[in-house]
Amino acid sequence: MRRYFPLITLILIVSCAPLSKYQELPEVKAWESDIEKFEQLDISKSYPSDAILFAGSSSIRLWSTIGKDMLPYNVIQRGYGGAKLSDFMVYADRIIYPHPCQAIVIFIANDIAGNDDDKSPLEVSQLFKKTLYIIRRKFKDTPVFWISITPTPSRWHVWPEIKEANGMIKEICSKNKNTYYIDTEKYFLSSSGLPKNELFVTDKLHLNEDGYAIWSKIIKNELNTVLKNK
């Protein structure tokens, strides 16, 4: 049985990660032009209210077949390369609020990448909590899906930290109503427990056509399971 935090508990938890800590960081402000492009799209194009909003980092942006792969669902695609939860959180209202939709699907994988400025798994989970709170201010009951961070060859050296962050986010999802964790890990690991190189392009980070085919099947199955009961 899923046990849910009351909203006031969520508010208290996320208060330790204020937006102001990140809003003025140059690496966050650098995405302003990308967000403005999304806003121009929102002005110039209309979307059906039953659409699924896919938002996050480059794996969302580069998903060229997303419209076909997600049929019969209508799709709104809002991905920008290099997104981290620390900047997505700042821009979440501008990305998500314009779109009353059937569900929101998020994939962000760059907060732990083997860099000096990596966040800890706990920090990643706190940023997810804050992002979820921002979404819930506008869309209290809209299903929110978090796609687990993929085990990739290029970031295998930090997989223990990524896996820990995944586990923390999974726990958060299990305790919040209408919030779902899409676990993709086992589909991208071989029988030896290593990432399947054949599912990635040459950078060994982003999915190739076969990788997206697996991703889309998992994600659509989760959407079908949840939304058919709504």
List each model region and its residues.
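N-terminal secretory targeting modules
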Residues: 1-54, 68, 226-230
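Active-site segments of SGNH/GDSL-like serine hydrolases
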Residues: 107-113, 133-164, 186
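Alpha-helix N-cap and loop-to-helix initiation/capping positions
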Residues: 119-127, 157-164
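Loop/turn elements at helix/coil->beta-strand transitions in domains of secreted/extracellular proteins
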Residues: 49-51, 73-74, 99-104, 139-143, ...
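Oxyanion-hole/transition-state-stabilizing segment in secreted/luminal serine hydrolases
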Residues: 60-74, 88-125, 145, 149-153
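Generic structural signal for well-ordered alpha-helices
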Residues: 92, 128-133, 166, 170
